[in-house]
């Protein structure tokens, strides 16, 4: 779609991962999608080749998001404009938080709660949980995160609750909320 390529592209990503390399899309996201080590190497080489053919810098932060969709958009824009200056890759969680005044809303909160499917090495690369955690720390609020699984532990002082393994979402959230409330009441010196 050539007319679409002629616009200014603002890509909001949920990760700062580049397209390739040890912190790239294949290495960071492949394992959670079921890719083996061999698969990851093939995927990484494929993304590197795509970047080479498209003349796109694979080290650009955020290009690893959404399976490398930004690579194609950057290539199209470069073909039409001669450079990639019409593609702007921004941290999506931060942009959404800022546009909704989340920092101001968190500022008066004693406890801030968020969730994450899997809390792992990629959580800190721009995911919602990391942005909400930063805002909570800046506001001196207690921060809690509920996740389906924790591969890594959150920062010290964070209340971390693993969701129970059940298909009943209401039950998961009710139990997680209760655990967070108890942990907060047991550790907080200022309640209410």
What annotation goes with each model-predicted range?
Residues 1-192:
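N-terminal loops that bind phosphate or other acidic moieties
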């Amino acid at each position: 779609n050539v007319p679409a390529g002629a616009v200014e592209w603002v890509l909001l990503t949920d990760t700062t991962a580049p397209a390739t390399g040890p912190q790239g899309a294949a290495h960071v996201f492949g394992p959670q999608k079921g890719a083996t080590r061999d698969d990851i190497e093939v995927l990484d080489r494929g993304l590197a080749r795509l970047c080479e053919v498209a003349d796109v810098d694979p080290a650009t932060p955020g290009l690893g998001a959404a399976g490398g969709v930004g690579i194609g958009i950057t290539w199209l824009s470069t073909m039409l404009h001669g450079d990639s200056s019409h593609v702007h890759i921004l941290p999506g969680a931060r942009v959404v938080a800022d546009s909704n005044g989340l920092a101001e809303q968190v500022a008066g909160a004693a406890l801030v709660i968020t969730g994450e499917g899997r809390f792992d090495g990629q959580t800190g690369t721009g995911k919602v949980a990391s942005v909400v955690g930063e805002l909570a720390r800046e506001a001196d609020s207690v921060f809690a995160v509920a996740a389906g699984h924790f591969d890594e532990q959150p920062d010290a002082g964070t209340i971390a609750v693993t969701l129970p393994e059940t298909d009943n979402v209401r039950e998961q959230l009710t139990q997680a909320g209760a655990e967070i409330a108890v942990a907060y009441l047991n550790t907080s010196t200022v309640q209410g």
